[in-house]
From Swiss-Prot:
Involved in pre-mRNA alternative splicing regulation. Could inhibit terminal muscle differentiation, acting at approximately the time of myogenin induction. It is found in: Nucleus; Cytoplasm. Keywords: Cytoplasm, Developmental protein, Metal-binding, mRNA processing, mRNA splicing, Nucleus, Repeat, Zinc, Zinc-finger. This is Muscleblind-like protein 3. The gene is mbnl3. Expressed in fast and slow myotomal muscle, heart, liver, skin, brain and testis. A zinc finger (C3H1-type) spans 13-41, 47-73, 177-205, 213-239. Pfam families: zf-CCCH, zf-CCCH_10, zf-CCCH_4. It comes from the Eukaryota. Belongs to the muscleblind family. One of its GO terms (cellular component) is nucleoplasm. GO terms for molecular function: RNA binding; zinc ion binding.
Length: 323
């Protein structure tokens, strides 16, 4: 079932902070070097922020005095990365909303949930082990966790994920953020873009290039502004590629942090059992379990439906003679 959604354009990913030194007229950096925006007089600045021109990112803005910012190459690269991340978030939100709409719209099909048999050792009597009136309910279902044996519970995950983990093939592959692909047109001498405009690396020395991957290793000291080597064997990227590397490192750190918080798929997570129903003052806590209540009520109804045994006979001097 498809859910149609009309989502307006979100301008948050197009918003840039304006350079305060530029507003005071004291910024010593140029537009292509400063990491903050240097808007023109025609741009609309609100609360120290300015919105970038979406048409300018596509290279199709024809307005003479555009009220939106036309960003330099290094800020344009940062905005393109923000736009891709924003699109991924919108698709994830749309998928989550479509999944939630299945529970509210009529005729929605619910996904089946795989369950496992409950504890059968609790059924000590044949009447509890089997009953034609309660044939769809396991004997251990509805009992409080505190009443079950004090053994840990195993929560099963995905069998495919467990098999993949056992084979050792589920380890994530970490992408390196200190490498840049070399421009093939630059290697042929046909690149029409400058070093500050091309999205690929333009190394000055051929010895920097890794021929197997056609990439160069970036000098991280140069990005941090502390490279003091005369002839550095690593690549010193321009400003727009530096912004791209910093954004990739930030995204990689976020992915690592989220992966560390979430358990791997398919693992058997051990859930500790709670102690017996005791409070700090020694009183027993009163707990109401709906499934247990319905189960006991069904047992009571099953007993009431059976015909009562009433002996029949004749009274003879206060003695009952059974027929």
């Amino acid at each position: 079932m498809a859910v149609n959604m009309t989502m307006g354009r979100d301008t948050k990913w197009l918003t840039l902070e304006v350079c305060r030194e530029f507003q005071r007229g004291t910024c010593s950096r140029s537009d292509a070097e400063c990491k903050f925006a240097h808007p023109s007089r025609s741009c609309h600045v609100e609360n120290g922020r300015v919105i970038a021109c979406f048409d300018s990112l596509k290279g199709r803005c024809t307005r003479e005095n555009c009220k939106y910012l036309h960003p330099p190459p290094h800020l344009k690269t940062q905005l393109e990365i923000n736009g891709r991340n924003n699109l991924i978030q919108q698709k994830a939100a749309a998928a989550m909303l479509a999944q939630q709409m299945q529970f509210m719209l009529p005729g929605a099909q619910l996904q089946p949930i795989t369950t496992f048999p409950m504890t059968h050792s609790l059924a000590t009597s044949p009447s509890m082990a089997f009953s034609p009136y309660l044939n769809h309910m396991g004997p251990g279902m509805g009992l409080m966790p505190e009443l079950l044996p004090s053994t840990p519970l195993l929560v099963p995950g995905s069998p495919t994920g467990l098999a993949a983990m056992s084979n050792g093939t589920s380890s994530p592959k970490h992408m390196r953020t200190d490498k840049l692909e070399v421009c093939r047109e630059f290697q042929r001498g046909n690149c029409t873009r400058g070093e500050s405009d091309c999205r690929y690396a333009h190394p000055l020395e051929a010895g920097m290039v890794d021929s197997s991957e056609n990439s160069v290793i970036v000098c991280m000291d140069y990005i941090k502004g502390r490279c003091s080597r005369d002839k550095c064997k690593y690549f010193h990227p321009p400003a727009h590629l530096q912004a791209r590397i910093k954004a990739s490192q930030h995204q990689a750190s976020q992915n690592t942090a989220s992966a560390a918080l979430s358990p791997p798929a398919g693992t058997m997570q051990l859930l500790p059992k709670r102690p017996v129903l005791e409070k700090s003052n020694g009183a027993v806590a009163g707990i109401f379990n709906p499934s247990m209540f319905h189960y006991q009520q069904a047992l009571a109804n099953m007993q009431l439906q059976q015909p009562a045994f009433i002996p029949t006979g004749e009274w003879c001097s206060g003695v009952v003679t059974l027929c």
